[in-house]
């Protein structure tokens, strides 16, 4: 029987085999811990992070979904400042639900296309 972490890592490996960020369309990846949420826009051809945002930068007491939405807005703004309009969304093995969905929707509303 596999644990939740083993299941997520197995899904992550399968997704990362299919998804790769390019210079024209970098990868927007998300990491979720119990308390924080992080997002990065990565160009996999050079291995460089073009933009990053996390809930650590926010000094807001709010529900986790609202904080995830604010991180989505921040990553969209940072990506546009780096000259990125379209991305490939990498949910990193997490279900597209809850905080991950809120972050993705906020990034879309912020102007990113994926």
UniProtKB/Swiss-Prot annotation:
Endpoints of the signal sequence: none
GO cellular component: cytosolic large ribosomal subunit
Gene Ontology BP terms: translation
Pfam families linked: Ribosomal_L18p
MF (Gene Ontology): 5S rRNA binding; structural constituent of ribosome
SUPFAM superfamilies reported for this sequence: Translational machinery components
Keyword list, A-Z: Ribonucleoprotein, Ribosomal protein, RNA-binding, rRNA-binding
Chain segments annotated as coiled-coil in the UniProt record: none
NCBIfam families: L18_bact
Family listed: Belongs to the universal ribosomal protein uL18 family.
Subunit structure, as described in the record: Part of the 50S ribosomal subunit; part of the 5S rRNA/L5/L18/L25 subcomplex. Contacts the 5S and 23S rRNAs.
Protein's job: This is one of the proteins that bind and probably mediate the attachment of the 5S RNA into the large ribosomal subunit, where it forms part of the central protuberance.
Name this protein carries in UniProt: Large ribosomal subunit protein uL18
Lineage: Bacteria, Pseudomonadati, Bacteroidota, Bacteroidia, Bacteroidales
């Amino acid at each position: 029987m596999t644990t939740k972490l083993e299941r997520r890592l197995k899904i992550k490996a399968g997704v990362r085999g299919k998804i790769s960020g390019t210079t024209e369309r970098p990868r927007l990846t998300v990491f979720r811990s119990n308390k924080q949420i992080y997002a990065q826009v990565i160009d996999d051809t050079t291995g460089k992070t073009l933009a990053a945002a996390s809930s650590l930068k926010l000094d807001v007491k709010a529900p986790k979904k609202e904080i995830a939405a604010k991180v989505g807005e921040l990553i969209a703004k940072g990506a546009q400042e780096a000259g990125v309009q379209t991305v490939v969304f990498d949910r990193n093995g997490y279900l597209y639900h809850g905080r991950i969905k809120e972050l993705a929707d906020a990034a879309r509303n912020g102007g990113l296309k994926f």
